[in-house]
């Protein structure tokens, strides 16, 4: 199968994007304490994630607590949870489909066309996963920036962009690149197969027995 390094690079990037998506979903550093104004000197750091919030005080170990009530969560947080969970599931499905489409795996036998379609499907799912990651990450970042510059919000309630958001953006970019490589591999493989013309087979010349018999009879009659 041609363009083999292309599919390997696409699957590796897809795997890295899946790991980054899972880490982004689980990490609590989506919203972190903002050290501005009179809040520059503080003795504690506050992290807020999709599933828990963590507080780290001076000379005290990190303390994390899961959100106790699902109904009390803001709609933006609930939507981000749902989208990130869907993204993790899609990335796992895309990776499994991509593995089935590899040259060494005999799930579809030696059918190169079927393998190319599997890799193309995997690439589309990776791109879709990147979109699902990009939406909640960018939405949360927009809310943080909007509240940060809102003078009506107290300084102690303002937050900054956490490391999980940057990891989410990086994961989405990796997923887009990996999915694009797999889709490109599928297109290149289809073009390659489109240039293959069937080789004409050798046909055994057909002889007409009746014609040969008639010719022989005429020849024998002429000699008589």
UniProtKB/Swiss-Prot annotation:
Q: Which residues lie on this side of the membrane: Cytoplasmic?
A: 1-7, 103-124, 186-224
Q: What is the effect of changing residue 48 to K/Q?
A: Decreased transepithelial resistance and anion selectivity. Higher permeability to chloride, sodium and also to larger anions, including pyruvate, nitrate, and thiocyanate
| GO MF entries | channel activity; chloride channel activity; identical protein binding; paracellular tight junction channel activity; structural molecule activity
Q: Which tissues carry this protein?
A: In the kidney, expressed in the proximal tubule and in the Henle's loop. In the distal convoluted tubule, not expressed in all tubules. Not detected in the collecting duct (at protein level).
Entries under PROSITE patterns matching the protein: CLAUDIN
- State the UniProt keywords alphabetically: Cell junction, Cell membrane, Chloride, Chloride channel, Ion channel, Ion transport, Membrane, Tight junction, Transmembrane, Transmembrane helix, Transport
Q: What is the effect of changing residue 65 to R?
A: Strongly reduced channel formation ability. Increased transepithelial resistance. Loss of anion selectivity in favor of cation selectivity
Topology in membrane: Multi-pass membrane protein
Give the result of residue 56 to T, as annotated.
Decreased anion selectivity. Increased permeabilities not only for chloride, but also for sodium and thiocyanate. No effect on transepithelial resistance
Tell me what effect the entry lists for residue 65 to E: No effect on channel formation ability. Loss of anion selectivity in favor of cation selectivity. No effect on transepithelial resistance
- Any single GO CC term annotated in Swiss-Prot or TrEMBL for this entry: bicellular tight junction
Effect recorded for residue 31 to E: Decreased transepithelial resistance and anion selectivity. Higher permeability to chloride, sodium and also to larger anions, including pyruvate, nitrate, and thiocyanate
In the record, the effect of residue 149 to A is given as:
Increased transepithelial resistance. No effect on localization to cell-cell junctions
Q: What functional role does this protein have? A: Channel-forming tight junction protein with selectivity for anions, including chloride and hydrogencarbonate, and for solutes smaller than 9 Angstrom in diameter. In the kidney proximal tubule, may be involved in paracellular reabsorption of filtered anions. Does not affect water permeability.
Description of how the protein assembles with itself and partners: Cannot form tight junction strands on its own. Interacts with OCLN.
Q: What is the name of the protein in this document?
A: Claudin-17
What is this protein's gene name? CLDN17
């Amino acid at each position: 199968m041609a363009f083999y390094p292309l599919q390997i690079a696409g699957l590796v990037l897809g795997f890295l994007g899946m790991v980054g998506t899972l880490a982004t979903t689980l990490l609590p550093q989506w919203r972190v304490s903002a050290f501005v104004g009179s809040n520059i000197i503080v003795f504690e750091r506050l992290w807020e994630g999709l599933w828990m919030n963590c507080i780290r005080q001076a000379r005290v170990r990190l303390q994390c607590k899961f959100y106790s009530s699902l109904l009390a969560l803001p709609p933006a947080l609930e939507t981000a949870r749902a989208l990130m969970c869907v993204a993790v599931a899609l990335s796992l499905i895309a990776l499994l489909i991509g593995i089935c489409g590899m040259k060494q795996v005999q799930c579809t036998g030696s059918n190169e066309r079927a393998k190319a379609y599997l890799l193309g499907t995997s690439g589309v799912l990776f791109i879709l996963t990147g979109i699902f990651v990009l939406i909640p990450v960018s939405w949360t970042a927009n809310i943080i920036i909007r509240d940060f510059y809102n003078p009506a919000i107290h300084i102690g309630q303002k937050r900054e962009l956490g490391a999980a958001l940057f990891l989410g953006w990086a994961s989405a970019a990796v997923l887009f690149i990996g999915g694009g490589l797999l889709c490109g591999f599928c297109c290149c493989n289809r073009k390659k197969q489109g240039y293959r013309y069937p080789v004409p087979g050798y046909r055994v010349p057909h002889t007409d027995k009746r014609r040969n018999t008639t010719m022989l009879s005429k020849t024998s009659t002429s000699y008589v």
